[in-house]
Amino acid sequence: MWRQGMFVLPFMTRLGVTNSWGGWTISGESTSNPGLWSYEGVAASHIILSGLLFLAAIWHWVFWDLELFRDPRTQQPALDLPKIFGIHLFLSGVLCFGFGAFHVTGLFGPGIWVSDPYGLTGAVEPVAPAWGAEGFDPYNPGGIAAHHIAAGIVGILAGLFHLSVRPPQRLYKALRMGNVETVLSSSIAAVFWAAFVVGGTMWYGCAATPIELFGPTRYQWDQGFFQQEIEKRVQTSVAGGASLSTAWSTIPEKLAFYDYIGNNPAKGGLFRSGPMDNGDGIAAGWLGHATFTDKNGRELFVRRMPTFFETFPVILIDGDGVVRADVPFRRAESKYSIEQVGVNVTFYGGELDGLTFTDPATVKKYARRAQLGEVFEFDRATLQSDGVFRSSPRAWFTFAHVSFALLFFFGHIWHGARTIFRDVFAGIDPDLDEQVEFGAFQKLGDVTTRRQAV
């Protein structure tokens, strides 16, 4: 789904929605009558809810003067903002606790998406809370359950505290708790902090942003994460007596596909819109692992392209890191060209399993493609793909949230300064408003001559 530019579906899926009214599931199986807990059902319920909220907004716009709270000292209608804060904190705590204790654990709900580090075995399943130090591992889904249960309890207790205890008068005045702009400023702070956090967890990866749903991170390419795992599996198979062809044939195509630079979210660009499939095309199949050897039988390895390069010289090195062959920029001065060194390429696993190519033009073609990781065949005709890499939803999510978090950070500073230094900006003490208001007193500023309404 991340290759197709799906943005909302991965978030639904990680919460346990896997079925569609179209009869398909995320795992490729067929289903019948998935009901409300489906992609379309969840989308429809949100559309209906948004409509109801819009109607509620109109109602409250019309009937805005609701006397829900009264100031006990003056008996005048007034918004009790600290009490409203306590109500919202309590309700959000209940929601947080309920999500962790019931939804994530599967006690009353489906659980969440859980997978292995290499994104191969992902499925929705119940998660047991991890209460020890292991719960702080960002890749441990048990920490998600434990955190929501713990944070929910804290939120419930804090909400009850703010419902039952009044803020000290000095603190109330210092933080301008009676001013609704204080609510705006502190709310913006909560939102931008959350946006920065989720931007980090999405870009660097964690249990809540599995690679099966959002695509790999750029650091997995930089560190050769999948390449090392593939090599480890192949070496284990060969050590067990399997041939190279058999060993590479046991590598899941999914794992090989992760080890391809086109899935690196940093390879796209902010000005290249559209899904990844509009770039290099729709992946049609793995051709196999390309192994290069020179005329002396020495195995050569193509140096892979770093993330932030659009073009990179084709260099083949041996096991000791010594350059043995290349595709030269100037053939007249070349010493290590494919033709001179006599390089051939053999494929293991995939569609070209067991085939060897000695033609220099073909060898150079696959050497260029091996720069980009495992070699895949792509269908570029269906979507008229232009061959220019696009970015995954992982990068777009990160960019959007960090950008808005930065804007909201300045918004928090702006509105916080406005509410705290309101008297400085206005030049008038806010408590003097009534005294200088025309018509409030028979004699301007004399509080003993309050004008009585008849």
UniProtKB/Swiss-Prot annotation:
Gene3D superfamilies membership: Photosystem II CP47 reaction center protein
Keyword Cell membrane belongs to the record: no
Q: Which GO terms describe its cellular component?
A: chloroplast thylakoid membrane; photosystem II
Q: Which InterPro entries match?
A: PS_antenna-like, PS_II_antenna-like_sf, PSII_PsbB
Q: What's one Pfam family here?
A: PSII
Membrane-traversing stretches: 6-26, 47-61, 86-102, 149-164, 183-198, 403-418
Q: Which residues form a coiled coil?
A: none
Cross-referenced SUPFAM superfamilies: Photosystem II antenna protein-like
Topological type in the membrane: Multi-pass membrane protein
Give UniProt keywords alphabetically.
Chlorophyll, Chloroplast, Chromophore, Membrane, Photosynthesis, Photosystem II, Plastid, Thylakoid, Transmembrane, Transmembrane helix
Entry cofactor note text? Binds multiple chlorophylls. PSII binds additional chlorophylls, carotenoids and specific lipids.
Q: Which GO terms describe its molecular function?
A: chlorophyll binding; electron transporter, transferring electrons within the cyclic electron transport pathway of photosynthesis activity
Q: Name the GO terms of the biological process aspect.
A: photosynthetic electron transport in photosystem II
Q: How does it assemble?
A: PSII is composed of 1 copy each of membrane proteins PsbA, PsbB, PsbC, PsbD, PsbE, PsbF, PsbH, PsbI, PsbJ, PsbK, PsbL, PsbM, PsbT, PsbX, PsbY, PsbZ, Psb30/Ycf12, at least 3 peripheral proteins of the oxygen-evolving complex and a large number of cofactors. It forms dimeric complexes.
Q: Tell me which family the UniProt entry assigns to this protein.
A: Belongs to the PsbB/PsbC family. PsbB subfamily.
The UniProt function text for this chain reads: One of the components of the core complex of photosystem II (PSII). It binds chlorophyll and helps catalyze the primary light-induced photochemical processes of PSII. PSII is a light-driven water:plastoquinone oxidoreductase, using light energy to abstract electrons from H(2)O, generating O(2) and a proton gradient subsequently used for ATP formation.
Return the protein name. Answer: Photosystem II CP47 reaction center protein
Species: Ostreococcus tauri
